[in-house]
Amino acid sequence: MAQEVIKIRGGRTLNGEVNISGAKNSAVAIIPATLLAQGHVKLEGLPQISDVKTLVSLLEDLNIKASLNGTELEVDTTEIQNAALPNNKVESLRASYYMMGAMLGRFKKCVIGLPGGCPLGPRPIDQHIKGFKALGAEIDESSTTSMKIEAKELKGAHIFLDMVSVGATINIMLAAVYATGQTVIENAAKEPEVVDVANFLTSMGANIKGAGTSTIKINGVKELHGSEYQVIPDRIEAGTYMCIAAACGENVILNNIVPKHVETLTAKFSELGVNVDVRDERIRINNNAPYQFVDIKTLVYPGFATDLQQPITPLLFMANGPSFVTDTIYPERFKHVEELKRMGANIEVDEGTATIKPSTLHGAEVYASDLRAGACLIIAGLIAEGVTTIYNVKHIYRGYTDIVEHLKALGADIWTETV
C-alpha cells in the first residue's frame, strides 16, 4: 500500500521565524470538555493536527454541531445525544479517553472503545478508573474492545492518585464538574495543560481551585454555559523547534512561547552551551556546537519533559563527551535508538538510560515508532550527511502542525514522497 515518507538532505543551516501552535495536550482535553457546555463554545488557537480532527468527529457522533476552521472550532451542544463511540476512531487516539470523563459528567453514562495512540509501553488508565469509581461510577470491562461506565449519581469524593498522571487529573476534573458536593484530587499533576483545562472549565462556570498545585478542589455546579477560549501555546512543539534551532539554526526566532513552560529546557541549553535569548513571548536561538556533554533525567512537570528526551538526543551527538539520558516516566521510550544506530549513531540503552557519545550521522532509511521519536529522527536527518528517509510519518502529523512546510521556510532541504 502506498504511504507518504519524509525525506531530508542534511547539512543546511536554518534561519527565520516559526510561530508555535496551540498546545496539543490541552486541545485534546478541551475539545471533549466542550460537550459539558450547555450552549455555544468557541475555541481559538487550536493546533492543526490529525488528533483535533478525530476528536471533532467524535463530538459530531454525539449530534453536536461542530465547525472546525483552521485554528478555530465552534461547537453547539443544544441537540447533544448520548451514543456509543465506535472503536475505529477511538483506537487511533489515546486522548479519546477524555471523552469518558466528559460523557460521564454530562450523561452519567458512556460506552467507549478502548483508546490507542503512541505505543510507549505500559500506559494504563487505572488511575482514571479509580477516580470515576470514587465519584460513584460502576465500570463494566467485560468487553475486550470497549468499556461501559455508568453512575446513578455522581458525588464529590476525596481522591488520592497513586501516581502523578496528567490524563487522570484532567479526566477526574471533567467528570467532577457536575458532581454534587466537593471533589478533591490529591497528588494532582501540575502541568500547564492541566491549568489550561481548568481555566477553560472555569470560563464556562465551573468552580475549580488549585490547578497547577498538587491539590485541586472542584465544587460541583448545576450548569456550564458557553464560552470563548484561547488555548495556550504548545511547550513541546516549542521545545522541539528549540532543539532544531540548536542543532542547525542560525538566528532562529520562535514566537508564541510561554518562557516559563520551557524553563527546564532553557536551563539544560545553558549547560550545553546553546546560545539562547529569551524575550517576552519569543526565543532566539543559534547553533553554538560543539556542546558540553550533559546528564538529563525526565521528571513530572516542572522537571524535564519526557516528550523532549527524544528530540534533544541528536544535539548530544554534537557534544564533546558522553551524555546520559534517563526516562523515569516512560523507561521504554527508546525505540528511536535502533533507528539512530542505522544513521551511524554511537548510542546504547540499558534499563531506561541511554548513553550517547559524539557521532557523525549519515542519511539512512528509518522508522518513526511514535510521535516524539519521529521528531528526533527529523532533527537527526537535518544534521546528517546525505539523505534520510523517514517512514510511518502519520505519528509525526499527529502532533506537529505543518512541520515539513515550517522547516522548508527555515531553509531545510526537506520534502515528502509517496512510495
From Swiss-Prot:
PANTHER family: UDP-N-ACETYLGLUCOSAMINE 1-CARBOXYVINYLTRANSFERASE, UDP-N-ACETYLGLUCOSAMINE 1-CARBOXYVINYLTRANSFERASE 2. GO terms for biological process: cell division; cell wall organization; peptidoglycan biosynthetic process; regulation of cell shape; UDP-N-acetylgalactosamine biosynthetic process. It holds the Pfam family EPSP_synthase. UDP-N-acetyl-alpha-D-glucosamine binds at R94, R123, P124, I125, D126, Q127, D307, I329. The keyword Cytoplasm applies. GO terms for molecular function: UDP-N-acetylglucosamine 1-carboxyvinyltransferase activity. GO terms for cellular component: cytoplasm. Its EC number is 2.5.1.7. It is found in: Cytoplasm. Belongs to the EPSP synthase family. MurA subfamily. The keyword Cytoplasm applies. The gene is murA2. This is UDP-N-acetylglucosamine 1-carboxyvinyltransferase 2. Pathway: Cell wall biogenesis; peptidoglycan biosynthesis. Cell wall formation. Adds enolpyruvyl to UDP-N-acetylglucosamine. Phosphoenolpyruvate binds at K24, N25. Keywords: Cell cycle, Cell division, Cell shape, Cell wall biogenesis/degradation, Cytoplasm, Peptidoglycan synthesis, Pyruvate, Transferase. The active site is at C118. It catalyses: phosphoenolpyruvate + UDP-N-acetyl-alpha-D-glucosamine = UDP-N-acetyl-3-O-(1-carboxyvinyl)-alpha-D-glucosamine + phosphate. The modification 2-(S-cysteinyl)pyruvic acid O-phosphothioketal is found at C118.
